[in-house]
C-alpha cells in the first residue's frame, strides 16, 4: 500500500493527491471539488440512482493501491443486478449482525457475572477497544494491499473464532482473549462494510446507501432482545454466542464470493491483470508484510493505550490505591509507549499509516474529533445501562433490551431522512447544528431521570433524542472524511476515523470504570442494611445476585439508590465532554457533494 512518505513539515509542501483545497472564487467556507473529482463527476451529475460511469474510463485508476484497482475493476464489469445483489447481501449481513448485537448485548452481563466479574465489564471493553483501535491499521492496509474480498474473509474468520472461544470459555481469562478476537473481527467487518459502501456509491447517495444497509436494525432491536431472554430461560448464555458462530459464516461468505467472481470476470476481460508472484522468499515476505501492515505501530498503539487506561479502573483494587507502585508504573509506561507510537509514525515507520495530509486537513481532523468525543461521552454511561434497566427499573431482559435498542430503531428511520436531505441539498454540515444541541440536551435530561422511582417513559424519551443526535453524528462523520480524500485513500481515511472512535470508546470506558469502582461499591456500603453489608462485594460483582433481592426489599432499594448515585456521575461526565462538540463541528468544511464523485463503473 502506497500510504505516503514520512510527515513533512517543510513550508509549502503539499502532495497533489491529498485533500482538496478551497477555491479562491468559492463562497466562504464552501468546498469546491478538485479538478479530478469534477472531471469524474461531469457525466455523473445526471445520475438519478444507479449510475454507470464505465463509459468515462474503461480501466481502473493507475498509481493507486492494488485493492482500489481491484474494486474499480469489479464495478467496471458487473451489471446493475450485480450491484443490487451486493446491496442485498450487505443488508443480510447487517441483519445477522443486528441480531448478534441485540442478543449478545443482553447476554454479556450474564456471561461476565458467571465468572463473578460483572464489575469488570469496563476492563474487558477497554482491552478490546484498544486492540480494535490499533488493528484498524493493518485491516486498512489489507484491504488496500490485498483487496476488499480478502480482508472481508479474514475478518469473518476472526469473528467466528472469537464466538467459538466465548461460547466455550470456562474462565474470565479465556473470555477476555475471546472478546479480543470477537471485537476485532466484527469491528473489522463493519469497517470493511463501510469501505465497500464507499466503493459502490456516489457521495451524493452515500447517506441513502448507509441508511439502507442500516435498516435491518429496526427489525433486530425487538426480535433480538426477546431471543436473548429465551436463550437465558431455555438454554444458557453460551448458546447465544455459539449459535452465531454457526450462522454468521454462512451469511457473510457470499459477499466474498460475489467480489471474487467479479474480479475473475475483470481479469478475463483484460481490465485488470492477475497478480504476479512477487518472487520474495518466505522470510522476505514476512519482513515485507510485517512493515507493510505496520505491525510495530499496532503493538505500540494497542499496548500503550491498554496499559495507560486500565489503571483508571483497577486502582481501587490495588493495595494502596493510586499510590500502588504498579498503578503508577502502568500509567507512566502507557503514556511513554503512546508517545513512541507518534514518533514512530512520524520518523521511523517505513510505510507510515498516518498521512500528513490527514493530520493537516481540518475536515478530517474535525470528523475524527467528533467521533472520538461522541464515543467517549457515550461509553461513559452505556456499559452498565442494561444492568440499570433490569435492577433499577425492574424490567425483564427482553424489555431492557428494547429500551437499550432505541438507537437502532430511531436510526433506521432517521438515516433515510438525513440521506435524502443530503441528496436534495448537497450539503451536510448544517445537520450538525441540529444534532449537537439536541444530543447534549437529552443527555443532560438523562442525569435527572436516571434515578430510582422514575417513569421509564422519560428514559425512553431521552434515548430517542440521544438517538436522533447520534444518528446524525454516525453518518456525517463518515461523509466528512470521505469527501476530503480521493478514492485511493478512502480505506485509510475511514481507518483513521474508526481509530479515533475506538480510542474515544476506550477512554470513555476507562472514565466509566473509574467512576463505577469509586462510587458504586462505596454507595452500597453506605446504603445496604447492616445484615447485607457482608454480601456487598458479591452484589458488586454479580448481576444475578443484585436481581435475586425482591423488588421493594430494603436490599434492592439500597442497590437501586447506589446505581442512581453512580449513573448520575457517569452521565454528568459524558455531558461535560460533549461540550467540545461545539468546537469540533466548526472544523468541518461545508462541502457540496452534489457534484462530487470518487468511484468508477456501475455504482449507486
From Swiss-Prot:
Gene Ontology biological-process entries: cellular response to iron ion starvation; ferric triacetylfusarinine C import into cell; transmembrane transport
Segments of this protein annotated with the region Disordered: 1-61
Residue intervals passing through the bilayer: 73-95, 115-137, 149-168, 178-200, 207-224, 237-259, 289-311, 326-343, 363-385, 400-422, 427-449, 454-476, 489-511, 566-588
Main subcellular localisation: membrane
Cellular component terms (Gene Ontology): plasma membrane
Bilayer disposition of the protein: Multi-pass membrane protein
A GO term, aspect molecular function: transmembrane transporter activity
Record-annotated disulphide pairs: none
CDD domains membership: MFS_ARN_like
Gene3D superfamilies: MFS general substrate transporter like domains
Alphabetical list of Pfam families matching this protein: MFS_1 (PF07690)
Protein name as annotated: Siderophore iron transporter mirB
